[in-house]
Amino acid sequence: MRIILLGPPGAGKGTQSERIVERYRVPQLSTGDMLRAAVAAETPVGLEAKAIMESGGLVSDAIVVGIVADRIEEADAKNGFILDGFPRTVEQAKALDAMLAQKGIALDAVVEFVVDETALVGRIAKRAEETAARGQPVRKDDTPEVFKTRLDAYRKQTAPLSDYYAGTGLLRKIDGMKPIDVVTGDVTALLDGFRETASS
């Protein structure tokens, strides 16, 4: 099972990722973690990334795709993986598609968590209020203002991926505003359907 998770910040991707990992025993691949691991392991791509990061540059799409390519060759990813946080742009998606095609690997689905942005901002504001009421510090990115900025960035940069993957026939939308356990049930039903198709 090879899937990509899409959805704006606050849509519950992290929670659902954890549950997918637990149920299907496939690793969640975070580009940040993979980048750090490649740098620490001093792989050829990792050394290239390290030099760029040390000079204050941004790691190119080609390097990130190279790191993903190395990571999915590892034993724990042989039966599948979840990509969360990558790709972020249509260009990255195209580069990822080309790399997977070279390896003869096909994605099973791109799962997009669809949310009501107004309700999402309300949810974040409520969480910030409850945190402050408990006398705990509110995380900077948990304030409605910062959250709206993150939502705007997502809409501009990552939302076009929805159209791109819809065009490939891989996109599956799930209502991310339902209670967490209901969303998990919807995700499970979807992914179990793919497993049955693959094994029949």
UniProtKB/Swiss-Prot annotation:
Q: What residue spans carry the region label NMP?
A: 30-59
GO terms of molecular function: adenylate kinase activity; ATP binding
GO biological process entries: AMP salvage
What is the main EC category here? transferase
Mind telling me which InterPro entries this protein's record contains?
Adenyl_kin_sub, Adenylat/UMP-CMP_kin, Adenylat_kinase_CS, P-loop_NTPase
| Catalytic reactions on record | AMP + ATP = 2 ADP
Identify the main location. Answer: cytoplasm
Domain of life, source organism: Bacteria
Q: Which Gene3D superfamilies match?
A: P-loop containing nucleotide triphosphate hydrolases
Binding locations of AMP: 31, 36, 57-59, 85-88, 92, 139, 150
List, alphabetically, the PROSITE patterns matched. ADENYLATE_KINASE (PS00113)
* Quaternary state and interactors: Monomer.
Q: Which HAMAP family match?
A: Adenylate_kinase_Adk
Q: Which family does it belong to?
A: Belongs to the adenylate kinase family.
**According to its UniProt entry, what is the function of this protein?**
Catalyzes the reversible transfer of the terminal phosphate group between ATP and AMP. Plays an important role in cellular energy homeostasis and in adenine nucleotide metabolism.
List the protein's name.
Adenylate kinase
Source organism per entry reads Methylorubrum extorquens (strain PA1) (Methylobacterium extorquens)
